[in-house]
Amino acid sequence: MTSSGKIRIYELSKDLGLENKDVLHAAEKLSIAAKSHSSSISDDEAKRIRGLLRQGSAANSAPPSKSEPGKTILSVKKAAPTAIKDVAPPMRKATSSSEISQVKPSAPANPTPTSPERLSRESVAHPAPPTRPVNPTTTPTSSPPKTAARPVNAPISRPATPSRPSAPTPRSANKPSSPVPPSTGSKDPRAGQTSTSSKATTVSGGGPRPKIISRPQSPAAPGRSAPPAKPSIPSDRKAPKPELVGRPKPKRPVVAPPSRPEPEGQRPDKKRPGISPRPIGGPNQRANTPQRPGAPIRQGKTRPGQPRSAGNTLELVGKPIRRDRSDAGSAGRDSNNRPGAPTRPGMPAGMRKPVAPGELMQLQKPTGRPGTPPPRRPDGTSVGTRGGSEGATPPVERPASPTAPKRPGHRPAQAPAAGAPRRPGRPDWDDSAKLEALRNKSPQKQRQKVHIIGENDDALTAETSGYAGEQQAVVLTASLARPAKPKSQKKPASKPVAALRKRKKETTRQRQRRRAMELRAAREAKQVRPEMLIVPEANLTVQELADMLSIESSEIIKSLFFKGITATVTQSLDLPTIEAVAEEFGVPVLQDDIEEAAKKTTEMIEETDLAHLIRRPPVVTVMGHVDHGKTSLLDAIRKARVAAVEAGGITQHIGAYQVEIDHGGQPRKITFLDTPGHQAFTAMRARGTKVTDIAVLVVAADDGVRPQTLEAISHARAAKVPIIVAINKTDKEGASPERVKQELSDQNLLSEEWGGDVVMVPVSAIKGENIDKLLEMILLVTEVEDLQANPDRLAKGTVIEAHLDKAKGPVATLLIQNGTLKTGDVLAAGPVLGKVRAMVDDSGARLKQAGPADAVEALGFSEVPTAGDEFEVYPDEKSARAVVGERASDARATRLAQQMASRRVSLAAMSGQASDGELKELNLILKADVQGSVEAILGSLEQLPKDEVQVRVLLSAPGEITETDVDLAAASGAVIVGFNTSMASGAKRAADATGVDVRDYDVIYKLLEDIQMAMEGLLEPELVEESLGEAEVRAVFTIGKSAVAGCYITTGKLQRNCRVRVRRAKQVVFEGDLDSLRRNKDDVKEVATGFECGIGCDRFANWEERDIIEAHKLVTKRRTLSSS
């Protein structure tokens, strides 16, 4: 099948199991243009051709019900084993839909039987020319008793006009025909063919009725031939006569199977459709007409679509029929109603009897070999026997098993030409006949073929090859078939399997087409674009972006090319470019998807806890913009002063505090989490929201809604927790709580006073106003939420913060969300294994155990755990270590990917910048007090412009600065940056010895500013044009070849060797250096405003009055980082 929905002729023939020429012939009948086997036709035309071929195949393969003219095949089998010595009367078989029967009377002149040896010599040495018989009829003859007949093929007559087979109807194949004596006469040929039972010829004399074999599919087994019957005087009895049968009128027109067009000289006369061929001796029939034998057809089942002409015939057992030389007139037609091939001189004019390959040797040599089968007579009668006794029982051949359709491997050979000369002492067959003789002798070959090809039989070759010729080949194949050996009886059953397996084998074209379809389907399935693109890092390569968008990388490269950007698949793209490309393909971009970090992914309460749940304290996260008073509000609640001791007055850690208050006469606990408000601590805020139950949003009354306020709102909504708004700083001048409510209403946070569902409480942290009301609202919302946990199980929770203490080692702040944590418990926090050695609360008091919603600091981890990881207590260390091992490998892979992403730069960009001297890198080693601070600083560094200077963080970890860090910095030329940490012993001395720059910060603002200034310091300073002044030309003085301009300084000043630009009528006519500056014939360095001077330039002398001279100089200026 071609890609345009067409099919080629050879592919259609392969599907139908036919030859190319058969399909071409069918296409010609349907007026379909097809020149050769490689021509393409449409699916509709292919369907028409298939219908035509299948219709013809069905018509030819059905059991025949009515005989047709010109298509008779008579097959005679060996007699069944009986003791009867009488001659069995031969019977003529009823014709099938594609056959016509004609029984020839025997006409030899000798009334006595002749021995086989004598006949062999006579037939070889003296072939008799064909003679014209005088109205012969058959009479009963005597023959040697109990000799089996060799299969005989009847001469086949062909009408003068082409005929189409009529629609066959089923008939009984086992019903014997009544014996009828033949006679010659002119009678309507259709009269003898209307009955469903076949009419046959008999010989006079009573005898047993011939036994009819009910399995017509297998060819007759060759046996011993009986002596031919003697001719007798024509009889005058009235009986249905064997005669040339004309063309009956078909009841229903049926399309004939496609066949090869006949040569011009062999086409029947279409103008005389009603004329039947006459026997020899008639007025319109010539004697000695050249005859051709039918083409052989392979043994066994016919192929699909092929008429089974021989397979459906009745096989008769009895005495063979003697042929007369008068058969020549009607034997000149083949089974397809075509003229036959001419016979050799001396041979009868009728169809020559096909002989087995073993008998060909006897025919070609003057004397026969002893022990070889005797040849046949030239008149068609059997000469000798194979030496069997009278009582020998011939083997009964069973029909072969159906075989799968199989295309012929070569063209079948045909009979030699009649006029071909024969050299004495030399066989006249070709090599193909020898080859086929060897094949016929092989017991493994079931499809017997005999090809007797003459030199001048090109037309016969064309007719008998392929689909059309196989219909004729059954006659020769059946006559030459030998009994199958018992070994090979089971082999035909395996042939259909082999044929089917061979047909299932894929060709190269089919395999390529299948792979192309699979690739196309996979590409179409892959092109399901995501609804939203989440960019985890600041940049992506073209290939990574193509994979995330489920498109080809070439599409992105083409899109970038149209935007003026030349990129490769390994090119790194920054966030603006990624957004532009993604929007072009209709996919929005979200960077770092901070909302995902705030979503609650793990359910802490399991099904086994449902029977043991009790109320637990709420976890409240205080969120809001920087400097809006979150920590001051917590100080007012806790009655402490944490804000006063914080560096820079801002919170840079997440803190966990537990407050116990009296509510309704009962003590109630509330756990508060204080989150940073600086923009660098987005991950900390998201972490706090992930574990919280209630979010308290602090908004300053004098500042309103700010960016981090909006971020806190999105975090709370992502975590699906209730929001309580605390409007702080109501005591300050300019405070407007109503304005804050209005701004919050724009974010779908509507106050209860305005008909919404959000609790808003105006408070003052400094004066302590409405603090009790805020706590009451928190407890009220807690009761509505119905927070519960199971304290009687092993603890589960989240790591809020972690850091490396100089004395205590790794320390983690844990929030227990379910169960009870006890000292000595073995827990796994992400990829870190720990055993609780000690626990302290927010006030520093040691604890033995901690229940749900408690926040504690735990000691005893193997290393600093990652903030935000969930921890779980295991019953023993073995199970915990197994879990940690799996997580550690995943954590290493993730950490390596992040490090590679931080230093990712495309090779093309690096080589280009290096060639221009623009490649700059700043190597950093970052040490901080807690994991959250490291996370915040790394996130801020990602936001810095990286077009001209790349920041590479070689090492980032919580803890103090060690001597190992100093050695790494010295080897890589890095700067050590510490945040709220100290230097270990020996690190300071090592840094001084190696000259490593160590910076320590306690406020994140200053740290980020210094890093940005260091990055700008790596940039080359740029030259900036600085204006000096202007002067106007008042007069021009010519001195030799040069000229001097007398000028008046209008603004600024002029300096010698400065850059000048001469403008004339707003056009620049010269730009260069000022070489000479004089005042009153003295060289001066500069001239100020309001003075006159003379100016000379070595490369310019075309001064004119009223020219404007602009003086400037180039100065270096520190470059700043550009975001583009």
UniProtKB/Swiss-Prot annotation:
Residues 484-493, 500-514 have a biased composition (Basic residues). InterPro entries: EF-G-like_DII (IPR053905), IF2_II (IPR044145), IF2_N (IPR006847), P-loop_NTPase (IPR027417), Small_GTP-bd (IPR005225), T_Tr_GTP-bd_dom (IPR000795), TF_IF2_bacterial-like (IPR000178), TIF_IF2 (IPR015760). Residues 674-677 are annotated as: G3. It comes from the Bacteria. Residues 728-731 are annotated as: G4. GO terms for cellular component: cytosol. PROSITE patterns: G_TR_2 (PS51722), IF2 (PS01176). Residues 615-787 form the tr-type G domain. Pfam families: EF-G_D2, GTP_EFTU, IF-2, IF2_N. GTP binds at residues 624-631, 674-678, 728-731. Residues 624-631 are annotated as: G1. Residues 649-653 are annotated as: G2. Residues 94-104, 192-203 have a biased composition (Polar residues). This is Translation initiation factor IF-2. It comes from Prochlorococcus marinus (strain MIT 9303). The lineage of its organism: Bacteria, Bacillati, Cyanobacteriota, Cyanophyceae, Synechococcales.
